[in-house]
Amino acid sequence: MKFFLDTANVDKIKEFNALGLVDGVTTNPSLIKKEGRDFYEVIKEICSIVEGPVSAEVIALDAEGMVNEAKELVKIAKNVVIKIPMTKEGMKAVNILSKEGIKTNVTLIFSANQALLAAKAGATYVSPFVGRLDDIGQDGLLLISEIMQIFGAYGIETEVIVASVRHPIHVTESAKMGADIATIPFDVLDKLFNHSLTDIGIEKFLADWDAHMKR
């Protein structure tokens, strides 16, 4: 499974990229707003840090506007991927962009039907939101299972990005299902490092070594 960072915080991207853990980055207007910086500047800087795909989202709601924005965004760097909402106009834009060789990430996927439509339109990636489904009492991970089953049955090459990841279980379970990518907030990625027995083990090793050195 590949790990993308779901953030526009350049410092955090640098921190985790230095560990060799960042295969790509996903952003959205809300994340960039938090940084208080120019949209294009942030995307350009992220692309200079990370070699993998960097998703940048369009704002337009009509296909023509999305395509025009996409063509400007891909000028920033070769690894920019255009994030498109799951709407009819969005699918029209994805169809156009895919024929021009521009990679797309269809976002706000909440059903297997939506994922299938996006794949048929030519999406490079689809982003099903597991956490938001959990929020309304549905099983977000069940959606990942359904999408992986359908894509596998038909040999669909569109990659699945597990999004709206809220805790490590989302990562573990989606990895078991064979999801291609999880896009993870840095606070959740931090939690993947942790286990109480690891901490206890380190403390014991250090205590034993300290006792040995005092002999």
Swiss-Prot record:
InterPro entries annotated for this entry? Aldolase_TIM (IPR013785), TAL/FSA (IPR001585), Transaldolase_3B (IPR022999), Transaldolase_3B/F6P_aldolase (IPR004731), Transaldolase_AS (IPR018225), TSA/FSA_arc/bac (IPR033919)
Question: Which source organism does the UniProt entry give?
Answer: Methanococcus maripaludis (strain C6 / ATCC BAA-1332)
> Gene of origin?
tal
Q: Which PANTHER family match?
A: FRUCTOSE-6-PHOSPHATE ALDOLASE 1-RELATED (PTHR10683:SF40), TRANSALDOLASE (PTHR10683)
Its EC top class is transferase
Enzyme Commission code(s) on record: 2.2.1.2
Q: Does the keyword Transferase apply?
A: yes
Pathway given for this chain reads: Carbohydrate degradation; pentose phosphate pathway; D-glyceraldehyde 3-phosphate and beta-D-fructose 6-phosphate from D-ribose 5-phosphate and D-xylulose 5-phosphate (non-oxidative stage): step 2/3
Report keywords, A-Z.
Cytoplasm, Pentose shunt, Schiff base, Transferase
Q: What is this protein called?
A: Probable transaldolase
